[in-house]
Amino acid sequence: MTNSNLRTENHFDYVKIKLASPERVMEWGQRTLPNGQVVGEVTKPETINYRTLKPEMDGLFCEKIFGPSKDWECHCGKYKRVRHRGIVCERCGVEVTESRVRRHRMGFIKLAAPVSHVWYLKGIPSYVAILLDMPLRDVEQIVYFNCYVVLDIGDSKDLKYKQLLTEDEWLEIEDEIYAEDSTIENEPIVGIGAEALKQLLEDLNLKEVAEQLREDIATSKGQKRAKLIKRLRVIDNFIATSASPEWMVLDAIPVIPPDLRPMVQLDGGRFATSDLNDLYRRVINRNNRLARLQEILAPEIIVRNEKRMLQEAVDALIDNGRRGRTVVGANNRPLKSLSDIIEGKQGRFRQNLLGKRVDYSGRSVIVVGPKLKMHQCGLPKEMAIELFQPFVIHRLIRQNIVNNIKAAKKLIQKADDEVMQVLQEVIEGHPILLNRAPTLHRLGIQAFEPKLVAGRAIQLHPLVCPAFNADFDGDQMAVHVPLAIEAQTEARMLMLASNNILSPATGDPIVTPSQDMVLGSYYLTAIQPQSKQPKFGDYSNTYASLEDVLQALEDKRIDLHDWVWVRFSGEIEDDDELQNPLKSETLKDGTRIEEWTYRRDRLDEDGSLISRYILTTVGRVVMNHTIIDAVAATS
């Protein structure tokens, strides 16, 4: 974030997400009070006192750490009122401030033993396994206390660095090391759990490993080369972000603000609480128990079991169910972990950040609009008047049709002709955005020029359907109105449907006729076997131009699949063109008439075409005439 302004929350350049160091995690939650006391560490699993219903000190809802639960009031009640703003109570240590600080002040839990972060260990791909160049199964055996790993071989010739040892194998090696006739001076060092993992990650010199990998990639090929490139890419990213691999092992856990995991009193005097509080409580209980066991120098097997339980508690807090048994609450419902809150359709991003309700938007069912141009869409009047209401009110007042906003709203409710006229002026040249969920690529949102239509359905040009993956069996689309001039310009220049002909993914045309259009084109040009072909010279079925045929169709004198003879001077493609005519006759004036299967040509003495009649169906005339018109309009 830029430091140019004190109100940094409104002035920042970009948001960067990267690994946090243990110091950074503690920095988020730690604060020094004016009396020099450092607060921020949550050490007790309690939430609120069952008698006073006030938060317990140093617990998950502690007022000293997170701020007061009532505005301008400390925990013990010595200071009340806004005039004591900023004072820290000398009795309870709570700062007198607004209660809303409990929505952003964080705490932390200092862990008695390091634990691995489940995202980096069990994610796909597993970054810990890639960095250490070890199989994921082996890394899991270390973290969950099933196997030892060799951290330093010492003087032993039989051991290898990063070799896995079972309990029995390590006991045998220990017996050899401590035997009376042992010649080993430097003992091999082994480790187990997340501490061993942290040591392995600390021992990595990223720059040296990256250099070595580049040399190996140059000489290797196939599957091995792909694996090396994968590892190098991860290492380069760590170097680029100045992150240390050992940060993937946690020494401290952030505790999110209490108002984001609230505890609410219900009518019967019972409490409803967020699942996160239960998950945090498990972590704190196990952490405190582990610290106590280490303090009293408990047997290693008990301490190790407690460390494994702490690792599982932290795994459940970060991503419940990712590994091992899912932690369940009352009535066997899995508890919602931090990952569950963030991810998925109901998660924080898709539901609350991207899926926000926005002003100047609406949604309706889509129907086909065959008379629309490709860059147009039909917008129901009812919807348009609601979406463009501020613009309409502004124009009504400016044109002195009404004097104030209240009168304008009344006029709009009546759906007066004047209002519709003004609405028409407002939407002229004002593009709107149409979006169909799910928006899987950028063509899921496109801009259109609105045309007012009756009814309550949005009309859409059939050619833009493939881009939206839309069909007309009840699909709904959302409408958004770009307000700023810049947004309108961008919509018109970049997002207009007629500018998005090619798919951004493949470069192939995405605007292709499909479904109804293909069926319509086929039906239009199809030949019906029962339709009789008229003889040449049958004046009731002979027309002077394509326009005459269209006029006759409009007047219902002929049907789409009727055969007609029509004069046509353009280029034609005929199956029997390469063969000789069926019949050729020279007239007295020197001109020649050639009979072909589907045409009659009259040629002069030099062989130049004088006139041509072709035998075709009315539907094909319609198709041909439409294409000629469209090509002529664009050229």
Swiss-Prot record:
Pfam families with a match to the protein in the record: RNA_pol_Rpb1_1, RNA_pol_Rpb1_2, RNA_pol_Rpb1_3
A Gene Ontology BP annotation from the UniProt entry: DNA-templated transcription
Sequence positions that bind Mg(2+): D471, D473, D475
Enzyme class: transferase
One annotated GO molecular function: zinc ion binding
Cofactor, free-text remark: Binds 1 Mg(2+) ion per subunit. Binds 1 Zn(2+) ion per subunit.
Presence of keyword Transport: no
A GO cellular component entry from the record: DNA-directed RNA polymerase complex
Catalytic activity: RNA(n) + a ribonucleoside 5'-triphosphate = RNA(n+1) + diphosphate
Enzyme nomenclature, EC number: 2.7.7.6
Cited Gene3D superfamilies: 1.10.40.90, 2.40.40.20, RNA polymerase II, clamp domain, RNA polymerase Rpb1, domain 3
Cofactor: Mg(2+); Zn(2+)
Positions with a binding annotation for Zn(2+): C74, C76, C89, C92
Keywords: DNA-directed RNA polymerase, Magnesium, Metal-binding, Nucleotidyltransferase, Transcription, Transferase, Zinc
Function: DNA-dependent RNA polymerase catalyzes the transcription of DNA into RNA using the four ribonucleoside triphosphates as substrates.
Entries under PANTHER family matching the protein: DNA-DIRECTED RNA POLYMERASE, DNA-DIRECTED RNA POLYMERASE SUBUNIT BETA
Annotated family: Belongs to the RNA polymerase beta' chain family. RpoC1 subfamily.
Subunit record text: In cyanobacteria the RNAP catalytic core is composed of 2 alpha, 1 beta, 1 beta', 1 gamma and 1 omega subunit. When a sigma factor is associated with the core the holoenzyme is formed, which can initiate transcription.
Protein name: DNA-directed RNA polymerase subunit gamma
